[in-house]
């Protein structure tokens, strides 16, 4: 039995230079579990609420001292003396302590930091990796990475509407090989942009963030980069997109406004046609948030139109929430769910969503947030849950490569038992 001796929280900085919370859970035996909580830029309306201080004189209102105080004064006293191995019971207690539907009282950041730190302390107590503690002996599948190589939307100050353009090395034989392929394409894209006199500055998630003639130009440059790296688009490497359509949806007018590029406005039906054309034209394997979070009719049309051809991922749509996912399953909307722990707020609730998705044949993609830290928990989680896919940004920022490097270590540790997921979407 490993008993919690103390729970401590501190304020650190995330990859955007904004404060976030880091929690330490220490046991009587001297083991320490430490977890840092990320933050999103394009957040879903239905996400659990992260608590910010809103004091404009300090960190422009983005401090997290209130959340830290809640950990120290409310959460810590009720966890001290409990076993770190009672994850479900501890997470349930945290939810009850908060007492709101969206964790607005204590803050999802305070709760999640504690939840993950408990799991890490438990793994440390047993002297086993986190992925093995969560997933057991069946945790051996390395995920296919969605490697972000171009940023737009809310993640970049450019004129591209679509938030993320990613490459998926589906023909790789190992995670290490997949990562190498993605790195080679990333650098080839940088060379292409430079040759054309375009900026090679990067966005929030490490992908290039140049101003381009159009959204289509990003696709064309990426195809060129794949070929220049020596690979066949659609055979060796496919393309995944995160449209983040909620960001350019005008709900009051029920139109999608491509305001950063051409300025065109599309109805839901017209946007479905837009995606149909792109799927026919380009080797796209996955589209995340192709419609806005509450455009259920648009999502239904999109799923009917191309759901048998590509992976349709709900991020803002489902927000890692079992109730939202259950509604999507009932209405046959999308076929995959993005898993972000801070959208729901505890490890146990995250696992509930993953299990519900698996039960109904939906794919799971374990994901980072745009405001990240050096914490690599999601790498372990992807392997623990045999999710098969991970989305953790580009290969040019340490907050992103920390996750990729952890997956390299895990693959090495698993040795001959490791399996690479490969092609993520098979109908």
Swiss-Prot record:
Transmembrane segments: none
PROSITE patterns, sorted: ENOLASE (PS00164)
EC number(s) from the headed UniProt entry: 4.2.1.11
UniProt source species: Amoebophilus asiaticus (strain 5a2)
Protein name: Enolase
Residues annotated for Mg(2+) binding in this entry: 242, 288, 315
Purpose of the protein: Catalyzes the reversible conversion of 2-phosphoglycerate (2-PG) into phosphoenolpyruvate (PEP). It is essential for the degradation of carbohydrates via glycolysis.
Major subcellular location class: cytoplasm
Source species, domain of life: Bacteria
HAMAP family recorded: Enolase
Catalytic-site annotation from UniProt: 205 (proton donor), 340 (proton acceptor)
Disulfide-bond pairs as recorded: none
Enzyme type, top EC level: lyase
List of residues binding (2R)-2-phosphoglycerate: 163, 340, 369-370, 391
A GO BP entry: glycolytic process
Cofactor: Mg(2+)
Reactions catalysed according to its record: (2R)-2-phosphoglycerate = phosphoenolpyruvate + H2O
Protein family according to the UniProt entry: Belongs to the enolase family.
Compartments, as annotated in UniProt: Cytoplasm; Secreted; Cell surface
Source taxonomy: Bacteria, Pseudomonadati, Bacteroidota, Cytophagia, Cytophagales
The keyword Methyltransferase belongs to this UniProt entry's keyword annotation: no
Gene Ontology molecular functions: magnesium ion binding; phosphopyruvate hydratase activity
The protein's annotated pathway: Carbohydrate degradation; glycolysis; pyruvate from D-glyceraldehyde 3-phosphate: step 4/5
């Amino acid at each position: 039995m490993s008993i919690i001796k103390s729970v401590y929280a501190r304020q650190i900085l995330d990859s955007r230079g904004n404060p976030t919370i880091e929690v330490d859970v220490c046991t009587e035996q001297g083991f320490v579990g430490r977890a840092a909580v990320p933050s999103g830029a394009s957040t879903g309306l239905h996400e659990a609420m992260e608590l910010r201080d809103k004091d404009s004189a300090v960190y422009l209102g983005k401090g997290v001292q209130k959340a830290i105080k809640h950990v120290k004064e409310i959460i810590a006293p009720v966890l001290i003396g409990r076993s770190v191995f009672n994850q479900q019971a501890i997470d349930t207690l945290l939810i009850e302590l908060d007492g709101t539907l969206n964790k607005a009282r204590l803050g999802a950041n305070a709760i999640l930091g504690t939840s993950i730190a408990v799991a890490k302390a438990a793994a440390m107590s047993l002297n086993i990796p986190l992925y093995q503690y969560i997933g057991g002996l069946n945790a051996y599948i390395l995920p296919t990475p969605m490697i972000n190589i171009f940023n737009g939307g809310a993640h970049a100050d450019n004129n591209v509407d679509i938030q993320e353009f990613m490459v998926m090395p589906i023909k790789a034989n190992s995670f290490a090989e997949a990562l190498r392929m993605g790195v080679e394409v990333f650098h080839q894209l940088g060379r292409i942009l430079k040759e054309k006199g375009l900026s090679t500055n990067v966005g929030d998630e490490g992908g290039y963030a140049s101003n381009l003639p159009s959204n289509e130009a990003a696709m064309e440059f990426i195809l060129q980069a794949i070929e220049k790296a020596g690979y066949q688009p659609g055979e060796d490497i496919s393309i995944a997109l995160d449209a983040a359509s909620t960001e350019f949806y005008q709900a009051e007018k029920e139109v999608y406004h491509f305001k950063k590029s051409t300025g065109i406005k599309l109805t839901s039906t017209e946007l479905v046609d837009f995606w149909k054309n792109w799927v026919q034209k380009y080797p796209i394997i996955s589209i995340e948030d192709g419609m806005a979070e509450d455009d259920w009719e648009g999502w239904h049309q999109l799923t009917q139109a191309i759901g048998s051809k590509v992976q349709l991922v709900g991020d803002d749509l489902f927000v890692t929430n079992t109730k939202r996912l259950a509604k999507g399953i009932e209405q046959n909307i999308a076929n995959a769910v993005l898993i972000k722990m801070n959208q729901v707020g505890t490890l146990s609730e995250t696992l509930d969503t993953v299990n519900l998705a698996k039960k109904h044949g939906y794919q799971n993609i374990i994901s980072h947030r745009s405001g990240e830290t050096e914490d690599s928990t999601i790498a372990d989680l992807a392997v623990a849950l045999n999710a098969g896919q991970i989305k953790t940004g580009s290969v040019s920022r340490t907050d992103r490569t920390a996750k990729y490097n952890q997956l390299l270590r895990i693959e090495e540790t698993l040795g001959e038992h490791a399996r690479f997921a490969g092609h993520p979407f098979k109908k």
